[in-house]
């Protein structure tokens, strides 16, 4: 149950529904309160909703449950950064690195927290972006509340909150300036009186360019312009990709990368183009670069997972020739550790399935299978049943379509008392070849040993349809009838009757019959109302169910 709730939480988180994710993770925690991963996942969900206090609490609980798990300190550091407690964030990342010194995510987090700590001491606006108060103020103000529904605005404010010096890059964004005014409790621009006095002059003059409230350095201005040009190139690349003009798409994505190397989506997009073009080596190279650069930039886990998934897809394409799916499987598994995406999980399952099928094809050898089966027969005759099972199992691996190997192994399991395993092999015989009579005799014998006499009789009767004169089947039916009649006549000892009834009550069919209100009334009528019982006996469905209860020892005929 906890695992199911966790899976639902992961799916909701993947779709961006963080509130629902929190609900599911909370349900999972209630079912499994000592699972540190659940607290870690809920911490990430709280952080995504800017609820950093709750994120911090869950991060601390994660570490309490699993103090040697480095990811817990990554969650703790992220929560402290969200609360603008940069000293504590630095300490958290350092503690995580003591456990896992090579963890790139912790290294990036430490560098980020250290930069933010330095900038927070020199930036006059840093107090405006402190912790959850920033999001509460923006939510409370009607003018900025609508902006929080815009993903690019939320992303921008997160960047500024992480490093207040980034404010200079977004001074032309009216939404950012509006938000800054709300946070500082001031209004940027002239008063309404000044606006009225200047109205006439404004109507006569050409509108002047909007002045930047704060001057950008030349380097910052150039960086912003490059980012804008890069996004434009990306947009044109997307258009070309949709038109399947892959050559032009590659050109645009390459230009975008040259203009801005801090956005790995240009690399993953170009990798997607290479994948479509069949240039798998180039695709893999771009994906590797995206992962490496993404870790340096501390990019979103989803972006890194996307790059790994794309690499895995390229490796699958290549494996169709090389027949080596292991690299693709490993890559998909890495992607899932970054971000559990249903599409990636499906790709992993498909790759594992194909790998297994290939292994079975390569291992298939009827000649060796027959040799192994004969070896098993030799050990069976010597009553060395465990050794016989070993050789029959190898024969099945070499040729999974040979019913004789399953039949022989079923006989071994029966001798060893492993009746459920023997029953499974006998049913496999019938599945592979319904006309293979030995499968019915094996299955019927095992069911008889399990004291499931009604089921054994059905199996023998099914076998008689394929071989009406088979003496083994006829004898099997006779033995089953004798056992069933013993129960119906009351010839069983109290212990035998109790055992048979207890076994019958485990049968879902018997449970359904006894829980059916109509059948319960029928049983009462058979005891108390002979006239009604006579009417019931005319109904074939009712009598079949009565016979089932008689066979199971639940009902006795006096």
UniProtKB/Swiss-Prot annotation:
Any single biological process term in GO: heat acclimation
Q: Where is the composition biased (Acidic residues)?
A: 209-218
Main site of residence?
Answer: cytoplasm
Renumbered to this chain, the Basic and acidic residues biased-composition regions fall at 196-208, 219-232
Q: Which InterPro entries match?
A: STI1/HOP_DP, STI1_HS-bd, TPR-like_helical_dom_sf, TPR_rpt
Q: How is it modified after translation?
A: Phosphorylated. Acetylated.
Region feature Disordered, mapped onto this chain:
191-232
Q: Where in the cell is it found?
A: Cytoplasm; Nucleus
Report the superkingdom from the record.
Eukaryota
What cellular component terms from Gene Ontology apply here? cytosol; nucleus
* Phenotype seen when the gene is deleted: Decreased thermotolerance after a long recovery (2 days) under nonstress conditions following an acclimation heat treatment.
Q: List the SMART domains hit by this protein, alphabetically.
A: STI1, TPR
Give an example GO molecular function: Hsp90 protein binding
User: Where does the STI1 domain start and stop, copy by copy?
Assistant: 131-170, 507-546
- Indicate yes or no for the key word Lipoprotein: no
Keyword tags: Acetylation, Chaperone, Cytoplasm, Nucleus, Phosphoprotein, Repeat, Stress response, TPR repeat
Q: Where is this motif: Bipartite nuclear localization signal?
A: 227-244
Q: Where are the TPR repeats?
A: 2-35, 37-69, 70-103, 136-173, 230-263, 265-297, 305-342, 369-402, 404-436, 437-470
Q: Could you give the domain comment from the record? A: The tetratricopeptide repeat (TPR) domain, forming a carboxylate clamp (CC), mediates interaction with the highly conserved 'EEVD' motif at the C-terminal ends of HSP90 and HSP70.
Q: What does this protein do?
A: Mediates the association of the molecular chaperones HSP70 and HSP90. Mediates nuclear encoded chloroplast preproteins binding to HSP90 prior to chloroplastic sorting. Involved in acclimation to heat.
On subunit structure and binding partners, the annotation says: Co-chaperone that forms a complex with HSP70 and HSP90 and preproteins (e.g. chloroplast preproteins).
**What is the recorded name of this protein?**
Hsp70-Hsp90 organizing protein 3
- Protein source organism: Arabidopsis thaliana (Mouse-ear cress)
Q: Which gene encodes it?
A: HOP3
